[in-house]
């Protein structure tokens, strides 16, 4: 199927509560525009250099999500336009995002990344680290970031029960943070989990945002 057909197919099967992030990393602008023309507005990139190059050449109403591991010294290159940064796993990174948001007179949405998988290669916080971050005076002083939810990546495995358990754990973390730290904040709503291979399981476990690349655009170039 074409990119357009894939977008329409995904949109038809997703619950209204679930947002689709079309992961356009490594893909040329003409394929991004094919998805855009099919109604897609949220796109995800995982390399600062690629995102900074694409953004000026594509429609201004695209909501760009940065979904990769973000180095602090590169935040400034996307701070002017990025809508949401998915993989935030340290106070130092949050402080830099806030600094660059102030410089650009805007607020940037951030998702706290939790380590829910077995692989050590995955980044992310555990619950204790997240709570220490949120309790800190340094965090409370940040005025130009909006913590809009959590994200995580499950173990790459065929064991569906394990994947479901990991997604369920992330939903539990979200609920605990919501009730303890964000009960008065209506913007804390997102659970970003699920990719091309496991998004159906993620939706069953409460995902509000799935990140889909190969099932829309085909295999990586």
Segments (PLM) and residue ranges:
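Conserved alpha/beta-domain cores
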Residues: 1-197, 203-205
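Gly/Pro- and small hydrophobic-enriched strand-loop and loop-to-helix capping segments
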Residues: 86, 207-221
């Amino acid at each position: 199927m074409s990119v357009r057909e894939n977008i329409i197919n995904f949109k038809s099967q997703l619950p209204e509560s679930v947002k689709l992030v079309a992961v356009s990393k490594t893909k040329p602008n003409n394929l991004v525009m094919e998805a855009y023309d099919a109604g897609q507005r949220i796109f995800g990139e995982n390399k600062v250099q690629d995102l900074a190059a694409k953004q000026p050449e594509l429609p201004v109403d695209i909501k760009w999500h940065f979904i990769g591991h973000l180095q602090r010294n590169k935040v400034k290159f996307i701070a002017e336009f990025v809508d949401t940064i998915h993989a935030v796993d340290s106070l130092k990174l949050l402080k830099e995002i806030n600094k660059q948001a102030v410089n650009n007179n805007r607020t940037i949405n951030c998702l706290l990344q939790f380590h829910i998988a077995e692989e050590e290669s995955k980044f992310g916080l555990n619950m204790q680290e997240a709570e220490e971050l949120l309790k800190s005076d340094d965090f409370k002083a940040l005025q130009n970031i909006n913590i809009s939810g959590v994200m995580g990546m499950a173990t790459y495995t065929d064991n569906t029960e394990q994947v479901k358990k990991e997604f369920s754990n992330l939903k539990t973390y979200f609920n605990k943070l919501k009730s303890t730290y964000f009960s008065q904040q209506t913007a804390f709503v997102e659970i970003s989990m699920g990719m091309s291979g496991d998004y159906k399981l993620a939706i069953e476990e409460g995902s509000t945002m799935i990140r889909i690349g190969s099932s829309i655009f085909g295999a990586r170039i």
